[in-house]
């Protein structure tokens, strides 16, 4: 059988622990037998990041900007315990944070729907994609404790030397806490364009929600920028694609989403997206059944699983014990990247392969073959659940793929 050829390389970012093991198995069993895989490889494993003083992460991010499509394995973001465990030179920053900073991207997370794994919200029959703005707000805040009798103010020092002072609160009767947070027009504009472009790419309605009735300057700025960019650049494109852009308040959005059948992109500010993405993931089944793609406003895509490195299973693996680690999200990271590479290069054969592998993965589960984490939540009349170990599950997917 002739392997599928690739004309443009895919940026491949390897990772850590159990997901690194699955990464190699996926390539061996599901990809290289069928594709003449063309990747520009970067080892983002923690030891290699340390060896290169994290230069490899920056190189991978800029390669993604150059080639337009990347696939990333889950990686360790070191804390103090990891610094000691790996004898690191320093506590390196999150690789995801570095890639986001270079691409100025927005993270889109979407559940993988399987017949037999029901959403906890019965009406949710189609995926809900969460688009989370990954910059600023409370995640880049400054905050302090305030003594009784103190007064808190915002001071804005103008470039002309003038200062604008706004009182936040006079803590005359009690001590308390205060924080300051920010965002930038540039970042909000990038967020908006990423959301509009992705909605056009996947042909889904886009919802955006803030609390502009209460936050009449901060949240209203988000609303205005989205509205201005939509009307100036995307209104006609959305109409041609048969999709809609819809703005509402965040509390109304929550109520609408719960009542909906799904099938939309829900764009959220940073904190809202952090909370709602976990809520949606849990309601649909698990983080191991969520896709994640980082999209830059200039059209670069980085695909990855929405979960971590599965440390507990990795330590079992090192002891020679059997593991049953869910690889579905990592498989879909590969298929998402291959599909996008195929679309950009006009390589229909590669695109069709990726779609077929996704269908084979879902069909394998629907036929009763799955990892142990899914076994307890899968219920389908006439289907017997047969839990598989990590590699056995991938072998079953290959068997399904070959018989399709």
What are the residue ranges of the model-derived segments?
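N-terminal alpha-helical transmembrane segments of multi-pass membrane transport
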Residues: 2-8, 18, 22-23, 28-52, ...
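Flexible, glycine/charged-enriched surface loops at secondary-structure junctions
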Residues: 35-41, 202-210, 234-247, 342-354, ...
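N-terminal small/polar loop signature for handling phosphorylated ligands or for N-terminal nucleophile
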Residues: 46-60, 223-264
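Glycine-rich phosphate/diphosphate-binding loop of Rossmann-like nucleotide-binding domains
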Residues: 6-25, 154-248
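Internal helix-turn-beta structural module
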Residues: 319-325, 343-404
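Glycine-rich phosphate/nucleotide-binding loop
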Residues: 257-356, 363-367
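N-terminal glycine-rich phosphate/adenylate-binding segment common to multiple enzyme folds
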Residues: 47-164, 271-275
């Amino acid at each position: 059988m002739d392997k599928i050829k690739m004309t443009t390389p895919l940026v491949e970012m390897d990772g850590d622990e159990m997901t690194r093991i699955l990464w190699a198995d996926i390539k061996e069993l599901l990809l290289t037998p069928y594709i003449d895989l063309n990747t520009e490889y970067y080892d983002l494993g923690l030891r290699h990041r340390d060896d290169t003083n994290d230069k490899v992460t920056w190189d991978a991010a800029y390669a993604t900007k150059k080639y337009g499509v990347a696939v990333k394995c889950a990686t360790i973001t070191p804390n103090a315990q990891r610094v000691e465990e790996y004898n690191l030179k320093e506590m390196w920053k999150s690789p995801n944070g570095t890639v986001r900073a270079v691409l100025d991207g927005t993270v889109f997370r979407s559940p993988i729907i399987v017949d037999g794994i029901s959403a906890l919200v019965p009406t949710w029959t189609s995926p809900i994609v969460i688009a989370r703005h990954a910059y600023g707000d409370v995640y880049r805040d400054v905050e302090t404790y305030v003594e009784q009798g103190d007064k808190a103010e915002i001071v804005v020092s103008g470039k002309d030397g003038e200062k604008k002072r706004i009182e936040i609160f006079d803590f005359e009767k009690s001590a308390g806490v205060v924080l300051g947070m920010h965002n930038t027009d540039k970042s909000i504009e990038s967020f908006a364009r990423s959301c509009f472009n992705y909605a056009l790419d996947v042909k889904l309605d886009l919802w955006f929600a803030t609390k502009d009735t209460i936050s009449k300057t901060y949240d209203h700025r988000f609303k205005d920028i989205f509205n201005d960019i939509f009307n100036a650049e995307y209104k006609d494109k959305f109409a041609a694609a048969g999709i809609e852009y819809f703005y509402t308040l965040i509390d109304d959005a929550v109520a609408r989403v719960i009542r909906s059948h799904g099938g939309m992109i829900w764009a959220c500010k940073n904190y809202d997206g952090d909370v709602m993405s976990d809520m949606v993931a849990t309601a649909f089944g698990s983080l191991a059944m969520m896709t994640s793609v980082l999209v830059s406003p200039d059209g670069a895509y980085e695909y990855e699983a929405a979960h971590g490195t599965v440390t507990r299973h990795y330590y079992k693996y090192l002891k020679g014990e059997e593991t049953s680690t869910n690889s579905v999200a990592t498989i879909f990271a590969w298929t998402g990247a291959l599909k996008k590479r195929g679309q950009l290069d006009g390589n229909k054969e590669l695109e069709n392969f990726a779609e077929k592998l996704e269908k084979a993965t879902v069909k394998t589960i629907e036929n009763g073959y799955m990892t142990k984490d899914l076994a307890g939540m899968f219920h389908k009349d006439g289907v017997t659940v047969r839990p598989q170990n990590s590699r056995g599950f991938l072998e079953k997917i290959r068997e399904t793929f070959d018989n399709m």
